């Protein structure tokens, strides 16, 4: 039976989403543009990733991540709903381009164990539906970090 771990640091969540995005899509080029290091408390979007074709056209992913463990591996004191609200605020403040008219995809990544609670927080939120915000649930299975993507059609009523 596969061992699944849902308690992750922010850096592990970022790595899981990055691994997932490398496997996603049919494009020939996948590249990481920026990765923040939570242990060094770097500012800005945590992960900027681009899936592109030979001509450089494609989708830009801007992901804000939150873990349920501190960078030293100890449990977080705040609840997942507080971390999620903080991530929403950060991603909204970082939005520079309307995602409806461009190939910009905004998302929030967190441990998969926190996803169901966060889905309930946003399912009726018109603004987040309008932004087409995605969720990514990171987890570790058999020693490999990966993630599950939750699309807007699955999140909002």
Residue ranges of each PLM-predicted region?
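Charged, structured surface patches that assemble and position nucleic-acid processing machinery
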Residues: 125-157
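Active-site beta-strand-loop-beta-strand hairpin of nuclease catalytic cores
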Residues: 48-66, 70, 101
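Residue-level detector of flexible, active-site-proximal loop/helix-junction positions
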Residues: 35, 69, 142-144
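Acidic-basic catalytic patches of nuclease active cores, encompassing PD-(D/E)XK
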Residues: 1-43, 51-56, 101
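Catalytic cores of nucleic-acid endonucleases
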Residues: 65-127, 136
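A structural micro-motif
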Residues: 26, 104, 131-133
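Amphipathic coiled-coil/heptad-repeat helices and related helical stalk/stem segments
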Residues: 43-44, 87
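Short, flexible beta-strand-to-coil junctions
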Residues: 52, 112-113, 139-142
């Amino acid at each position: 039976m596969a061992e699944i771990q849902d308690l992750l640091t922010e850096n592990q969540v970022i790595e899981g989403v990055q691994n997932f995005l490398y496997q996603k899509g049919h494009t020939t080029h996948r590249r990481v543009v920026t990765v923040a290091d939570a242990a060094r408390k770097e500012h800005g979007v945590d992960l900027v990733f681009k899936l592109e074709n030979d001509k450089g056209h494609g989708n830009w992913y801007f992901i804000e991540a939150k873990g349920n463990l501190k960078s030293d591996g100890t449990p977080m004191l705040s609840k997942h709903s507080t971390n999620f609200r903080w991530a929403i605020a950060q991603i909204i403040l970082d939005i520079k381009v309307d995602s409806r008219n461009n190939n910009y995809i905004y998302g929030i990544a967190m441990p998969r164990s926190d996803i169901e609670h966060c889905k309930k927080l946003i399912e009726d939120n018109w603004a987040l539906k309008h932004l087409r915000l995605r969720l990514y649930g990171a987890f570790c299975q058999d020693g490999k970090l990966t993630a599950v993507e939750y699309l807007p059609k699955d999140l909002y009523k």
